Amino acid sequence: MTNKKADVGIFGGSGFYSFMEDIEEVSIKTPYGEPSDNLFLGKIGSATVAFLPRHGRKHSIPPHKINYRANLWAMKELGITRIISPCAVGSLQKEITPGDFVVSDQYVDRTRGRIDTFYDGPIATHVSAADPYCPELRELAIRATEESKVKCHKTGTIVVIQGPRFSTKSESKWFTLMGWSTINMTQYPEAHLARELEMCVVNIALATDYDCGLVGDVLPVSHNEVMLVFQKNLDKLRNVLFKLITVIPKERAKCKCNEILKHARFT
């Protein structure tokens, strides 16, 4: 337990919290083990924000080894009800160009073996994932991209692969033919676990490259190339996040995210 409190939680890459003020580092223990790192608390406008580098501050934890439950529970310990989950993605569609933003409204889980629920019994709990992202936060995020004057796609399906390897060309072509928008390694189970805890969650994806199967002469992607594009657009993403955080209302009046378990349990 901790006596620290925050309004909004952000998962992201190391150094992402540098735009916050009055930063304090906090260690939180959870029933599910250690989070990826300590959390960094700071101010953005009037909001207290908690930041957690999902891969650890030295990017030492691969996506399939992240303790997603501990990360989300640490946010819950701070009293957080809103989660912003930005990430780098590969584009699966030509109209989504490197540097574009996508406010995802759906995901497809192609991971395997990840622990993806808090509810292993004794009460059967079946949380709906029909609309996995908070409609109110999505609306506010889209508005923030518009005010920041960045190119944004207002909907998109993000396919989440196991990692740490990138896709084969055949896999990538299949994802494109399915009509999915982007590809990533961390959105699942991160987004779903937030939902199980009745948190509002929004994904803001930044396209860093075209995935390998989209165009015939695209060279295989490398992690270094992804990070170069991500760093180039980091200021834009920070600006979007700042605008979003400053307009999130205190009360959750326009969504039902806080009532998810009411319709999920058999007693």
What are these regions (language model features)?
Residues 185-223:
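Zn-dependent metallopeptidase/amidohydrolase metal-coordination segment
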Residues 72, 172, 188-191:
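Generic hydrophobic/aromatic pocket-lining and core-packing "Φ" positions
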Residues 76-79, 176, 195:
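Non-catalytic positions within long, well-ordered alpha-helices that form the structural scaffold/packing
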Residues 81-82, 181, 200:
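Short acidic/polar active-site loop segments enriched in Thr and Asp
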Residues 1-130:
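Metabolite-binding pocket within alpha/beta catalytic cores that recognizes anionic/polar moieties
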Residues 212-264:
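His/Asp/Glu-rich mid-to-C-terminal helical/loop segments that flank catalytic regions of hydrolases
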Residues 132-177:
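Active-site rim beta-loop-alpha module in soluble metabolic enzymes
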